[in-house]
Amino acid sequence: MAEPGHNPHPSARDGGKTERRTPRLLWLLLWAGTTFQVTLGTGPELHACKESEYHFEYTACDSTGSRWRVAVPHSPGLCTSLPDPVKGTECSFSCNAGEFLDMKDQSCKPCAEGRYSLGTGIRFDEWDELPHGFASLSANLEVDDSISESTENCTSSKWVPRGDYIASNTDECTATLMYAVNLKQSGTVNFEYYYPDSSIIFEFFVQNDQCQPSADDSRWMKTTEKGWVELNRGNNVLYWRTTAFSVWSKVSKPVLVRNIAITGVAYTSECFPCKPGTYAAKQGSPFCKLCPANYYSNKGETSCHPCDADKYSEKGSSTCKVRPACTDKDYFYTHTACDAQGETQLMYKWAIPKICGEDLEGAVKLPASGVKTRCPPCNPGFFKTDNSTCEPCPYGSYSNGSDCTHCPAGTEPAVGFEYKWWNTLPSNMETTVLSGINFEYKGLTGWEVAGDHIYTAVGASDNDFMILTLVVPGFRPPQSVVADTENKEVARITFVFETICSVNCELYFMVGMNSRTNTPVETWKGTKGKQSYTYTIEENATVSFTWAFQRTTLHETGRKYTNDVAKIYSINVTNVMGGVASYCRPCALEASDLGSSCTSCPAGHYINRDSGTCHLCPSNTILKAHQPYGAQACVPCGPGTKNNKIHSLCYNDCTFSRNTPSRIFNYNFSALAGTVSLAGVPSFTSKGLKYFHHFTLSLCGNQGKKMAVCTDNVTDLRIPDGEAGFSKSVTAYVCQVVIIPSEVMGYKAGVSSQPVSLADRLVGVSTDMTLEGIVSPVELFHPETSGIPDIVFFFRSNDVTQSCSSGRSTTIRLRCNPMKAAPGTLRLPSMCSDGTCDGCNFHFLWESVAACPLCSASDYHTFVSSCVAGIQKTTYMWREPKLCSGGISLPEQRVTICKTIDFWLKVGISAGTCTAILLTVLTCYFWKKNQKLEYKYSKLVMNATLKDCDLPAADSCAIMEGEDVEDDFIFTSKKSLFGKIKSFTSKRTPDGFDSVPLKTSSGGPDMDM
């Protein structure tokens, strides 16, 4: 023991005199130890440190790559006389897997039995609690101040250890799992994860000691798989971060992470004991093996121990459980394959693994097997062989499950798969069980055949997923479908099913393309009666259809609800490449040297069943692409629409006409033909997550091509525009997507999720409020006041869901508003801020000047001015308010030459004068004519007086009784103008006779009057 004031290490004070340069950190440690001894020198005497009271550590590496090994006490101040520092191994030194670095002699030694090591790495595979060094943090996203009082706290939203793995949060909070590690050399981090739900954002990234993130190539997790990321030398902080945003009632499924392994730590000073349920029988083991079923092990075991006869255990168990008595929930029934006599046997089997005891009190016995029944017929398209097996009919023939029959002339087989008899599992189907505890496949049978249906078998636990998969290599759609770029339907799958459940069971239907991860399409919860479901395949690729049934989501083992089952009665897939046929359909005939053969009709042509010839569909009709037989296959288009070039769809060419008794209103919506977007009002979840619905619309034109695109970028926020990648993209006339703003998530781009098609087919365009069952309530929007009725576009979606059994519908109401320049303004119903009041029927109001009718001559006034200085102007002005757009232009002002009032007055006087002269001339003319008649009459009177003379008979007219005798004598002698006027003014005598002087003709006798 050193005396007070004496320093046993003078070199600590005079380090500059030594010839060997000792690292500064080493001198600091030595000086601290000496000072510590001097300070306590007056206290009780300390004993020399034993090997169990200290451990060795390396100092930090210097610039030359060197380090020192120093002894560090477990509890400072309890002992003294620690070993002197010695030069350590190189900083890059490491041991192999299965070895550890013995710090006492600084050499690698193999791990003992029951232990393992990764050499230069560490592994985390036990998650009963959060391992040392890990941290789980949670945080709210952007929370609106107005709802802060009702916002739930996020402090409990963290990653939760669950034994074999750690699970993420499932709410709208952000949960982060962190681990910091210092690497002596470049290494990797490797982990397995289960990422089943796209409504969760899952990202993994690494930051260095300057808090700078590494390249984000692997930041966004795409699918369930094993992942690894390279790590740089130095400090690395690993982040696993999740954020759920299921804005609907659906509860997201958590992300699961397990088996995290990190390499590059340079050395491991000890081996890790095998966790319970595993063992390592040999020295130098890099990993521990799982105990088989009905065996168990404790921590650090070299072998597994068998369970007692009355106990059992699952694979990798640390304890054995008491076997319960067998019940009817522990066995299931199935059917054997048909024998040579065409019979099948009903067989009862214990569920695997068998955990119950038959000999226990109250245990049930396995029912007797072997009851024979007649085999059901083969599935359509198959025939029964001599040994009672079913084989597919060759191409060109069909069957209903019995014998194969060649298709008649003029027909071709309708290939597909139709399964409705379940005596054996079809060759293109397989079944398995996925553990609901550790999410590993167990290699068990998940579905069993039962004659007229297939049902879920008994699993190892009620939360296991009973999986059934059907793989289709590809499709062979009709040529008319291939030519139609807008009709994406290449095939359909229809299945009939039911579920019988006593708790919260779930049946999932999933679809995977080209071996990619299955995407959930539809989910049914609880008991569902026997019903049919149809899904449309829109991509010609290798497709896998998966049905997964889970009896309960509770995280516990046991069989309590084995009577909860899912049954599938039939599965029908159309247009399958290499499929079989249950019937033959008519085809178009093509003449050849070998006779007639089937061929495809051109797009838009239907097949005449009798002649096998192709005929073009009439105008304004479309062809049923998958049933092009007969004239009835041509379906009329709705009002206001027309067919495209190949008669595959009805569309509106951005024009519309409306007839009224007074005029015809024409419309042109070309200014509205592009895509437009509309965001709904912001909403908030219970955790305060801000989101809104975003709509994209394409109204008309483009030959009916769907222009609105909505994308799900949750699984990969880095995909370029136009590339599908792992994202789900929806193309329609109207689509909807849920958007979380970029300022909320902290990403460069906003997060879009759950794209939905709202309009796949244009039903018609009309001013009516109802069309083919689709209603556009006028009361949803403020009433129009212009007097011009709204034009309504009626759309329908092909998506059929449980809540929307008839599919979704969309109405877009176009309203004339001269104050809204094109393209105008889109509005949502005020009482339904998300565009729908029931989740199935969506409504939009589009106000624009482009929605007004085209201008015509009826839309302007004509004003004619007075004649000023010989000029008259004609002016045209629009009627107010102007409720038209486009069409004819307002005519320019017209200027014409005109005559003043003075001119017309002169014309009138001249015309009057001429008229007076004309009347005078006419008067004279008729007067003269009258004088001639007067003369003739006078002559007749003179002849009448010669009664008794021998004169010739008078040439006169008879005088009727009561008539006056008036004789006018016409004098042959000419008179002057004055004499004519005087004669004209003479008057008759009072007795009614005129005094006429008579002149006797020459040579005649004198007569007395």
From Swiss-Prot:
It is found in: Cell membrane; Late endosome membrane; Golgi apparatus, trans-Golgi network membrane; Lysosome membrane. Residues 928-1009 are cytoplasmic. The chain crosses the membrane at residues 907-927. It comes from the Eukaryota. It is a single-pass type I membrane protein; Single-pass membrane protein. The keyword Iron does not apply. One of its GO terms (cellular component) is lysosomal membrane. Glycans are attached at residues 153, 387, 400. GO terms for biological process: autophagy. Residues 36-906 are extracellular. PROSITE patterns: MRH. Residues 652-854 form the MRH domain. Residues 1-35 form the signal peptide. Keywords: Autophagy, Cell membrane, Disulfide bond, Endoplasmic reticulum, Endosome, Glycoprotein, Golgi apparatus, Lysosome, Membrane, Signal, Transmembrane, Transmembrane helix. Residues 988-1009 are annotated as: Disordered. Pfam families: ELAPOR1_C, GBD_ELAPOR1, GBD_ELAPOR1-like_3rd, MRH_ELAPOR1_9th, TNFR_ELAPOR1_6th. Disulfide bonds join 274-291, 304-326, 307-338, 654-700, 710-735, 804-840, 816-852. May protect cells from cell death by inducing cytosolic vacuolization and up-regulating the autophagy pathway. May play a role in apoptosis and cell proliferation through its interaction with HSPA5. Interacts with HSPA5; may regulate the function of HSPA5 in apoptosis and cell proliferation. Belongs to the ELAPOR family. This is Endosome/lysosome-associated apoptosis and autophagy regulator 1. It comes from Mus musculus.
